[in-house]
Amino acid sequence: YSPDGLVGETGSIEVKSRAPKKHLATILADEVPAENMAQIQCGLLVSGRLWCDYLSYCGGMPMWRKRVHPDPAWFCAIIAAATNFEAVVADITNTYTEAVVGLPATERIDYTEGIVI
């Protein structure tokens, strides 16, 4: 997790630069856009921070801030998704490992070797 900033010992910030239409919609709704909430809640989960200030801005318009606190329901959903992802990756890895047993390895050619930019 890489927050846009840490605030004191307990807070963090996430800053989004928005197009005017999106920024206006955020201000009028007075809530963090759904597409950003997973990022914020995941950040709170892994960092242990107590809050995150979500900042939305668009040049020439007022900056908007909303303080977000940890949400146990989000934490459960994030942990469940991560656990499921780990199981899927482990299954794919095992399937691949079994499928390639005894197959000959091929040479990998690096066509960019020697190119200097």
Please tell me what each predicted stretch does.
Residues 1-117:
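Accessory terminal regions of nucleic-acid processing enzymes
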